[in-house]
Amino acid sequence: MIIEYDKKYDEQIKDSLVELQEHIQNIDLEGYNILTEEFRESYFSKTMDEIQKCNGKILLYKEENDIVGLVIGLINNDAEETYEFKAPKRGRITELIVSKNIRSNGIGTQLLNAMENYLKSIGCKDILLGAFAYNEKAIKFYEKNGYHVRMTDMTKTNL
């Protein structure tokens, strides 16, 4: 079941964030994503700061006493603050994580839909998210749920 963020789940949230980054590290062909000992606490702290700063929200998927998935959404209006044009109010999904041992059971779709509904309810007109290029399953998942590529980051390596 989907529940609102509760501080008592912080350690499980940290575990989920690390699990995602370990997955990214394993599929990163360039080997850029190297997790340090400080990563777990530092990434969680920065994530929580960003949630607070950007009127964000964490939704958790709970089975019994375990958090097996989460989604983080923020208000993303960087363009309004940076450039001389007016952009619609946008949401941004920064994390969508489902524990690897229970993926493909609809939990990711439920979390994504719940965050989309929340962002829509607070006036967001569209939602941005990023997916690591080598995470083909995630990209297919997002496309299946109506997302499309709007911008592509490119890298030149071995300079």
Give the label of every model feature segment:
Residues 1-28:
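A short beta-loop-alpha structural element at the N-terminal edge
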Residues 22-47:
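Conserved GNAT-fold acetyl-CoA-binding loop/helix
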Residues 45-60, 92:
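A short helix-loop-beta-strand connector motif used in the catalytic cores of GNAT acetyltransferases and
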Residues 60, 66-75, 92, 97:
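Conserved beta-strand in the GNAT
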Residues 84-100, 130, 152-155:
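Conserved acetyl-CoA binding element of GNAT-fold acetyltransferases
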Residues 95-98, 104-117, 121, 140-144:
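Conserved acetyl-CoA-binding loop-helix of GNAT-fold acetyltransferases
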Residues 114, 128-138, 155-159:
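Conserved beta-strand-loop-alpha-helix junction that forms the acyl-donor binding cleft
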Residues 124, 143-152:
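Conserved acetyl-CoA-binding loop of GNAT-fold acetyltransferases
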